[in-house]
Amino acid sequence: MASFKIEGGHRLDGTITPQGAKNEALQILCAVLLTPEKVTIHNIPDIIDINKLIFILGELGVKINKLDKNSYTFQADNINLEYLESPEFKRDGSSLRGSIMIVGPLLARFGKGYIPRPGGDKIGRRRLDTHFEGFIRLGATFRYNKEEYFYGVEAPDGLFGSEMLLDEASVTGTANIIMASVLAEGTTKIYNAACEPYIQQLSKMLNSMGANITGVGSNLLVIEGVSSLGGCTHSVLPDMIEIGSWIGVAAMTQSELTIKNVSWENLGQIPSVFKKLGIQLEKRGDDIFIPSQESYEIQNYIDGSVLTVSDAPWPGFTPDLLSIILVVATQAKGTVLIHQKMFESRLFFVDKLIDMGAKVILCDPHRATVIGHNRQSQLKATKMSSPDIRAGISLLIAALSAKGTSIINNIEQIDRGYEDIENRLRSLGAKIERIEA
């Protein structure tokens, strides 16, 4: 297992360009299964989770041509459905949560889709019910092999449009149901659909392939089924989570950074939440400029009560950045309550921050109060392990600001979501190296 060795306390300086959005790319890659024609995708991040999915597509028989580091063509004109029932697929699919999204396209085009119980981050119970209830509403039959933890849906007579009210605005669930619906007979209406930019991008891509999806950007999607889809060219948005991570790096290390080509219109509440912590952000065209700040102060509510930062489905604040907000707050002036509503164990990494000297009170699995040091006390370096992608990058940010040299183990978790992170940090002046065990 590899580790990062980080010498903290150094200010960074320079310009960084965010990678393509991981969560969008997972959906877009699965959508190539909907057509036998060639699909070209640009700005695909070169990270573990994406590369695992590309490998699975290749094993399914998709012809893959790598144009450059972040661009590929895919052609799913000779799919090997037998792979879905192989021991290799049970191994490969179970290691990646995003693999669940191959089920919708396979069900739509071939009448069946199978998946082992997916893996990914261990950040609480993340149900798959929304996916399969949607498929059942479209006319599929569902089966689950408890012994082998294997899910399957089949629709030998095809899928048929239906109205459905999702019990949760699941991003991956919405994406999966959209991809199943585009080739269904008739009209599908999805109420309480997720409307994140990732879903908007998927819908725009499918429409460019010949689908008929309206209501894009709202929580009511109407899909008129078509008989087939064609090829297209698509470019993945910059990763809003990585953009928020770079803002956190700049704030904690008192650095002046410019983040290029951020797609401001798709950042939602991210800039405003950081500003509530006192972080200065400047819009320069489609870039974010963050000046070096000696200190920053959390804004209380107008009645003087303590600020609460909580997550919610889009257009609410993304849960993927709450751990970074928590770390940034440790050096702010003031107090903030972090309320993680959507997952019940994403805050459990705070014990590592407390070991570093942060003042954090874990109220329960969903809430933590952070009392900022106002730069009066620097975090102390320590040895720690990365429990998941977002906690991992948050601990890395804390280590970059800490006094002394920190070691972070289990960094494959960080590699799952962040492309070439140590070299990109070094280009800004960070003292970080990868140690292979």
Question: Where do the protein language model's features map onto the residues?
Answer:
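Short, structured segments at the rim of ligand-binding sites
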Residues: 1-437
